[in-house]
Regions:
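An acidic/histidine-cluster motif and surrounding catalytic segment
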Residues: 1-64, 68-229
């Protein structure tokens, strides 16, 4: 897929596999609470990729897992440069692939707590530096500091910075999930079908994409019970 889009400036990083190894040998401190070894493998793999990113002088990096599907770009009515020019100046992370068990919001928005997936995101250098400083200790990783709600990749990366989300890309259902395979039919599939429906049908009727890239700073941030007052 990267070859098709003529993407040449990329680096593949081998991941940690926690399916048959609890990975305690790469951790410093206590084993993180309420996390499976597969989740530990996912989090540490992303931190490993950030360390590689910081060896360059790039101001930001586009992180993709092997199940990321960028074929939605065929239906875009804009270019990557068009989108990048509209990104909030103070962002730390832009989540670009979303699994939401309730509803996926197509407009750029401050990430909801149930916007799951680290299949693809854009991260700034300064946020990667922060995460590496907090969680990388030499060749080992420290995940026992009490990240809320857990130190899984979504929470660790997104909740620690100014994170926005927009479903520009998808994820490949046929590859399953090495972390929560039971969620494929329940959460992944419904989000997948909704996002594909948007890109294949609704997006073709959009003449001006600026409203989709202009986030509402108040959306989803009003205290419970305050609505309508």
């Amino acid at each position: 897929m990267l070859k098709y889009w003529e993407v040449e400036n990329y680096t593949r990083i081998s991941a940690y596999d926690g399916r048959e190894d609890d990975l305690s040998d790469i951790l410093k401190g206590r084993y993180p609470d309420m996390m499976s070894s597969s989740e530990v493998g996912c989090t540490t793999s992303h931190l490993k990729a950030m360390k590689e990113f910081l060896k360059t002088d790039a101001p930001c990096a586009l992180m993709m897992e092997d199940d990321c599907d960028i074929s939605t770009a065929s239906y875009w009515g804009f270019t990557w440069k068009d989108f990048y020019a509209k990104i909030p100046y103070d962002y730390d992370v832009i989540q670009l692939a979303i699994i939401n068990p309730a509803q996926v919001y197509a407009q750029l928005h401050r990430r909801f707590v149930n916007d799951f997936s680290t299949a693809c995101y854009l991260i700034t250098r300064h946020h990667a530096e922060k995460l590496v400083r907090l969680h990388c200790k030499g060749e080992k990783y420290k995940l026992d500091q009490g990240a809320k709600p857990r130190a899984v990749a979504d929470d660790l990366i997104y909740n620690s910075g100014n994170t926005f989300a927009i479903p520009l890309f998808l994820y490949k259902l046929e590859l399953g999930s090495s972390i929560h395979d039971i969620h494929i039919d329940v959460f992944h599939k419904s989000s997948y079908e909704g996002i594909w429906q948007f890109w294949k049908a609704q997006s073709q009727e959009v003449d001006n994409w600026d409203p989709y890239f202009n986030y509402d700073p108040y959306f989803g941030r009003i205290p419970p019970g305050f609505e309508g007052k």
